[in-house]
Amino acid sequence: MKQLWKRLFPIGLATLSLCMIPSCGNQSTPTNERDNTFESPILSGESDTPDITPDVDTPSQAESATNSGDLLAPEPPVESSEASAPVDQDEDRPDGRNWSSVFAMPTADEINAYQNQSTHRAPYITGWLSIPGDTRYTEYVVDFKADLLPDGTYCCLGNWQMDYSYLERQYTSVRTEYSGVSGYAGFQSLGDGTRVSIMSFWDVYCTDADGSVTTIRAQRVYPEVTDQTEDFSGEGTGAHCIVPYNWKAGYWYQMHLKCGVSQSTGNTIVEQWVYDYATGESTLLCAYDLGAPNVCFKGASAFFLENFLEPLSGEVRTMEVRTPAYLDADTQEWYAIASAEMHSEGGLPQYEGSYNFGADSECFWMITSGVGGDWYGNGTGQQGGTFSIG
């Protein structure tokens, strides 16, 4: 894990997927120092290097829970040799995992035959990172890669709950559409081949003592203009931002979510960044004002691999996740997350096919296809459980 952690901080639409929300599971984690080279145009104010002191209330000692993560000794960030110059991402793609050693790969004919009559989606695999439920954190990072990346794929890297205790002190009840899920973020390959990032926040419903309900919807503050529809519905209501980002199969990236304070409203802002290990470039993708101050992430966060287009469900898709970590809001220490509860979601009639998932010394991994019969609960596919890396 320490060797991987040296890589963790070298930096500081045809079709939209409204995915099934995974059911909740449980987390631990990096270093107490890092070189913050993400220069935020939203949060920086007058400073070139933004102060990311968390915009959250610090609880009393009695309210603070003991963090079960393993605190790692600080290690200085190192420059990646691959990041010294851009690479030709077609000719120089690195070798990937030997997927055929863990999965019965369907032939092209089998895939085509299945997709000609498919009305189902391929299996849907989730991993809930082992962050204690009462842990509050202001930043979250995770590395990801998809060796096999057909259209109709969503690699979700974060599916989280927000700590709305500030609002809970003012209202009788505060809820989102899905218990324990306030937002998610990740990367997609759309039906026309366009590659994008996405970040979504569900509406927050606040009920006061006389029964009046106030709805708080996150407001996009970056980018200023987007071609995609801001609002969503179908699986609850809220706001999302979809940004073109040409992420490529077979390459490692890092997604970084960070909370800060809006200079204009005083509310919490959440930014979504991506770092490309091959080119050494970091990019601010989008940012949302959450409509309330003193908000941060809380408890478990999930990653999942989804096929959201039935006509492409036979294709083989993969995802690998490594070095997930969070910045604890109370201790201001980074913690590395070494385990996740991984399992398949759903079942017939919506999902069918074959799948496998697991973990090794470096990362969590998952692979799916609509071809085959290892669907959820018939006992022939990989059974869910706790998997560890490092």
Go through each PLM region and give its residues:
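C-terminal motif of bacterial Sec signal peptides marking the signal peptidase cleavage site
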Residues: 20-23
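Bacterial signal peptide processing site
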Residues: 25-27
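Activation corresponds to long, low-complexity, non-globular regions
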Residues: 102-136, 145-152, 310-390
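Short, aromatic/His-centered strand-loop micro-motif at the edge of beta-sheets
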Residues: 232-252
